[in-house]
């Protein structure tokens, strides 16, 4: 069947509606003919189902592929993903999110699409705002959002991305006590033996320096400070104000306040939050801890990121793969105005 390449579309005559759309759901009817996207046309051309003409010249697959790449950004990436999904047996249609994918055993007209797919090269930076907006758009119409990443060898990795509202089960985020502590070089120590034991065993804060004294991280210290649990002094005995503590902590960690915002949000929502350093993340997070002697496996790994953050996909891939390999969810805590919004990213199979 002969077709015409026009701009970023391939136009076919009336008979194509019956041959391609009504049987395979390729393209969309327009007027009396059929309009195919470039990836759909390339797929059909590769299988010898149609011929494509440009200004009187018939295009072979190579020439058409080159022309399509000139006319549509990321064409080759989209074709790789489209071809993969079609060969898996899915009905796939182009959409604003790159593709919409129908459930197995279904097709357009029988049921609604189930998945929105966004295509990305491993080399491209991915703004978190773009990802958030895309996920929310999908979830608003009850769709699953899939990020399809094409690596330099044209292999595909699929990630499910969704919003999350983590909820913990700790009823007492901080014990009702008051005690003194000292800000040393890059951590804080609480000195009172009873208070240290209570914070450690009931609140699951810090790590005991010895049988009587408790070491606290900077985010733990500011959280307890903000709740009036500890009074923090410098090494000469001067009491810190809240702002002075933040200023000093920020000299030690440039992103301290962003990290603290995520920590506070997680603690306030009933979680136990500990360092995620061994996993290469900001935090490991527990929904419930009943005893310091029997700490369960953490449910989440969390990285705090700013609203203008751009993912390097190789780094994101490593974080997600590690989290999934140890049966944890990888959450990204996005600081947005005064709120924290979470993205849950996990590898998935199509």
UniProtKB/Swiss-Prot annotation:
Role of this protein: Endonuclease that removes tRNA introns. Cleaves pre-tRNA at the 5'- and 3'-splice sites to release the intron. The products are an intron and two tRNA half-molecules bearing 2',3' cyclic phosphate and 5'-OH termini. Recognizes a pseudosymmetric substrate in which 2 bulged loops of 3 bases are separated by a stem of 4 bp.
Coiled-coil residues: none
EC code: 4.6.1.16
Active-site residue numbers: 286, 297, 328
Cellular-component GO terms for this entry: cytoplasm
Keyword terms, alphabetized: Lyase, tRNA processing
Single biological process term from Gene Ontology: tRNA splicing, via endonucleolytic cleavage and ligation
Catalytic reaction equation(s): pretRNA = a 3'-half-tRNA molecule with a 5'-OH end + a 5'-half-tRNA molecule with a 2',3'-cyclic phosphate end + an intron with a 2',3'-cyclic phosphate and a 5'-hydroxyl terminus
Quaternary data: Homodimer.
MF (Gene Ontology): lyase activity; nucleic acid binding; tRNA-intron endonuclease activity
InterPro entries according to UniProt: tRNA_endonuc-like_dom_sf, tRNA_intron_Endo_cat-like_sf, tRNA_intron_Endonuc_cat-like, tRNA_intron_Endonuc_N, tRNA_intron_Endonuc_N_sf, tRNA_splic, tRNA_splic_arch_long
Name used for this protein in its record: tRNA-splicing endonuclease
Database matches in NCBIfam families: endA, PRK09300.1-3
Keyword tRNA processing: yes
Similarity comment: Belongs to the tRNA-intron endonuclease family. Archaeal long subfamily.
Source organism of this protein record: Methanosarcina barkeri (strain Fusaro / DSM 804)
């Amino acid at each position: 069947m002969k077709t015409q390449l026009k701009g970023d579309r391939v136009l076919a005559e009336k008979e194509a509606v019956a041959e391609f759309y009504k049987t395979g759901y390729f393209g969309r009817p327009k007027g009396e003919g059929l309009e195919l996207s470039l990836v759909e046309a390339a797929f059909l051309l590769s299988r010898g189902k149609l011929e494509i003409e440009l200004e009187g010249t018939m295009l072979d697959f190579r020439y058409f592929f080159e022309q399509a790449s000139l006319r549509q950004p990321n064409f080759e990436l989209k074709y790789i993903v489209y071809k993969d999904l079609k060969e898996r047996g899915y009905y796939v249609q182009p959409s604003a999110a790159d593709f919409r994918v129908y459930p197995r055993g279904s097709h357009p007209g029988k049921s609604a699409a189930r998945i929105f797919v966004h295509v990305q090269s491993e080399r491209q930076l991915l703004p978190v705002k773009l990802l958030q907006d895309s996920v929310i758009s999908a979830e608003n119409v009850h769709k699953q959002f899939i990020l399809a990443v094409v690596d330099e060898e044209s292999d595909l990795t699929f990630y499910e991305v969704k919003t999350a509202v983590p909820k913990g089960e700790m009823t007492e985020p901080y014990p009702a006590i008051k005690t003194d502590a000292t800000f040393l070089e890059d951590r804080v120590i609480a000195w009172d033996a009873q208070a240290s034991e209570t914070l450690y065993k009931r609140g699951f804060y810090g790590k005991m320096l010895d049988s009587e004294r408790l070491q606290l991280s900077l985010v733990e210290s500011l959280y307890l400070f903000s709740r009036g649990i500890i009074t923090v002094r410098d090494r000469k005995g001067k009491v810190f104000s809240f702002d002075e503590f933040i200023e000093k902590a920020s000299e030690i960690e440039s992103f301290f306040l962003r990290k603290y915002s995520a920590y506070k949000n997680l603690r306030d929502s009933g979680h136990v939050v500990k360092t995620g350093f061994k996993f290469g993340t900001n935090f490991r997070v527990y929904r419930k801890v009943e005893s310091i002697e029997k700490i369960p496996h953490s449910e989440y790994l969390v990285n705090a990121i700013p609203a203008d953050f751009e993912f390097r996909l190789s780094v994101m891939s490593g974080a997600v793969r590690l989290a999934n390999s140890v049966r944890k969810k990888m959450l990204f805590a996005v600081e947005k105005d005064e709120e924290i919004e979470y993205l849950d990213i996990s590898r998935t199979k199509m």
